[in-house]
């Protein structure tokens, strides 16, 4: 298990905010990471934009579109993390989709993430049964592959929790909101 993630949960529950990298810009994202840390974030999720974020609601989908339209790439996100790590040791995990990792090259993506100081990786579109392809590379480089648990059977929850690293991302609902709501 990653040391910084373990330390983030030493006091029990952790405050874990999320931000889509590059919305509205990578410079603003960097400053928001510092602000979140200053506000008490125990760990920060950095979303690497993807063109088809199927596990997200409309607000984060639009943030992904804006970031990609603004020219955000995986390499530019990595460069931003390098800058952040010069000023911050707050635990950070990437949240992105398997295709982002595949297209970059799984080994190259995870190795680079580790080298720049990332602590974990969340891939919401990778089922528990298919995580091994990523898990072995993550373990090799000291990155926690964060497991997701959606509403499911008690047996499946127990199995996923038993094998989890870092922390468990609990999905509270399988519903996606496809139209804007007042909560946007």
Residues covered by each model-derived region:
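N-terminal amphipathic alpha-helix/helix-capping segment at the start of soluble metabolic enzymes
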Residues: 1-16
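Active-site-adjacent beta->alpha loops and helix N-cap segments on the catalytic face
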Residues: 2-3, 55-57, 74-79, 103-104, ...
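Glycine-rich, proline-tolerant flexible connector loops at the mouths of alpha/beta enzymes
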Residues: 45-72
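Conserved, mostly hydrophobic/aromatic
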Residues: 47, 113, 160
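Active-site beta->alpha loop and helix N-cap motifs at the rims of alpha/beta catalytic domains
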Residues: 64-122
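Catalytic beta/alpha-barrel core
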Residues: 119-130, 144-152
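Anionic-ligand binding region
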Residues: 135, 150-167
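Conserved small/polar residues in nucleotide/adenosyl-binding loops
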Residues: 177-184
